[in-house]
Amino acid sequence: MSAASLIPVSSLPSLASPFKGNVKTLVAKPCLCPCLKIQRTKLRVSVVNKAASAYNVKSSGENVRFRLDNLGPQPGSRKRPKRKGRGIAAGQGASCGFGMRGQKSRSGPGIMRGFEGGQMPLYRRLPKLRGIAGGMHAGLPKYVNVNLTDIENAGFQDGEEVSLETLKAKRVINPSGRERKLPLKILADGELSKKLTIKAGAFSTSAKEKLEYAGCSLIVLPGRKKWVKPSVAKNLARAEEYFAKKRGGETASEPAPV
């Protein structure tokens, strides 16, 4: 018995035109190729909300590792700003969030910073800073001060020179900023037991007495001259010459002591 006799012709699908042959002559033949079933795995796509994921991570536990896909702001931390002056639809009412009347409801730049309604503002009620706190030149230091105690503890030997450079080398002073251009001044705190040669821009009165008593040689370095106009310098020279002559005449007119 053949395979064609097992399948009735009536069970064959009806073929529509344009087939022009005899349908009864068609014979169904078994397929020699095995049927292959291919299973395709569907990719699942999930949409994650950042804010919700951050909230879930916080509530799930502390052992959850933070990643780029679960980072987000905390719920309620980011609020939408008020849209003032954009009509009733912005949710601020008919006055659009500016109130009824007044200077703050008008157009323009508004009031100045620090304005308190006409009374004396706080930044004018407080006293002004004077001296070095206010940055005035009169309150700034004019010298790098060094006491006799610092020179004694620096380890200088007899006959050595004490100056701004040697004090820097021994790390007694470490001026910075504008202090690097200032001259040296010796103050009288402490005692000095060695005979030294001290070069400084100024000496205090008591320090000068102590150093002369200890046998030290003092050298006053010339200060930095301030620039003045030539006409002003000429007038200053004339005034100095005039007062020098006047002082000389007064000393000559004084009677000699008996």
From Swiss-Prot:
GO-annotated molecular function: mRNA binding; structural constituent of ribosome
Superkingdom as given in the UniProt entry: Eukaryota
Subcellular location: Plastid, Chloroplast
Membership in a protein family: Belongs to the universal ribosomal protein uL15 family.
SUPFAM superfamilies: Ribosomal proteins L15p and L18e
Transit peptide: 1-65
Gene3D superfamilies: 3.100.10.10
Natural source organism: Pisum sativum
UniProt key word Disulfide bond: no
InterPro entries in UniProt: Ribosomal_uL15, Ribosomal_uL15/eL18, Ribosomal_uL15/eL18_sf, Ribosomal_uL15_bac-type, Ribosomal_uL15_CS
Name assigned to this protein: Large ribosomal subunit protein uL15c
GO BP field: translation
Region (Disordered): 67-90
Basic residues: compositionally biased ranges: 77-86
PANTHER family per record: 50S RIBOSOMAL PROTEIN L15 (PTHR12934), LARGE RIBOSOMAL SUBUNIT PROTEIN UL15M (PTHR12934:SF11)
Gene Ontology cellular-component terms listed: chloroplast; cytosolic large ribosomal subunit
Location, primary (coarse class): plastid
Assembly behavior: Part of the 50S ribosomal subunit.
Keywords: Chloroplast, Plastid, Ribonucleoprotein, Ribosomal protein, Transit peptide
